Amino acid sequence: MLKKSSLASVVTIAGTDPCGGAGIQADIKAISATGAYPASVITVLVAQNTCHVTAIQEIPLCFIQQQIDAVFSDLAIGAVKLGMLYQEEIIHLLVNNLKKYQPPFIVLDPVMITQTGHLLLKPQAINALVNDLFPLAALITPNIPEAETILKSPINDFNSLRDAAITLAKQYKISVLLKGGHLKSVDSPDI
């Protein structure tokens, strides 16, 4: 038992990826690589591989709540990383719990769509994500399609990438790491 130990614990709250390239599995690897202790709360089960998503299975909200309570009641949480949240009800549940448990640092990756076009956030949940969850985060890490969706503006080159990062930071009063991997250029700059 790590009951409120001094070991830095980072909880990732997200969906799964059975191939380990994204989601909870990738977050656990990244957190472990920093020397922190990874914990997780699964929001949705995703059947996917490196090519496509075949199915998404929702998890009952009461079970997500039980996972949150189990982790936060036992570990000293130094940070929370939010990923695939899928629906508005999960976002509202998290907003209430983040206000209750008040973790010192929240990173939000506003996962919305796969590279193959499969929706990972229901469209009606975007407003809740932006209006209710952004204000609680210290850092957001959108990719280009996510930033375009949030800003309703295209990002075509490095200058528009930079401008989008600045606009997001100013508009939401938040730190931004805008991932440039979708930019059609020789390099893929992050800002």
Language model features with spans:
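Conserved phosphate/ATP/ADP-binding segment of small-molecule kinases
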Residues: P123-I191
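Conserved N-terminal subdomain of the carbohydrate kinase-like
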Residues: L2-T12, S32-Q115
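Rossmann-like NAD(P)(H) cofactor-binding subdomain of soluble oxidoreductases
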Residues: D109-L121, A125, L129
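Short glycine-enriched, charge-decorated loop/helix-capping segments at active-site entrances
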Residues: H52-I59, H118-P123, K152-N156
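Glycine/serine-rich anion-binding loops at beta->alpha junctions
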Residues: I13-S32
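Acidic-glycine-rich active-site phosphate/pyrophosphate-binding loop
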Residues: M1-S6, G23, D187-I191
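Glycine- and other small-residue-rich loops at beta-strand/loop junctions that grip anionic moieties
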Residues: T16, L82-G83, H118, K179
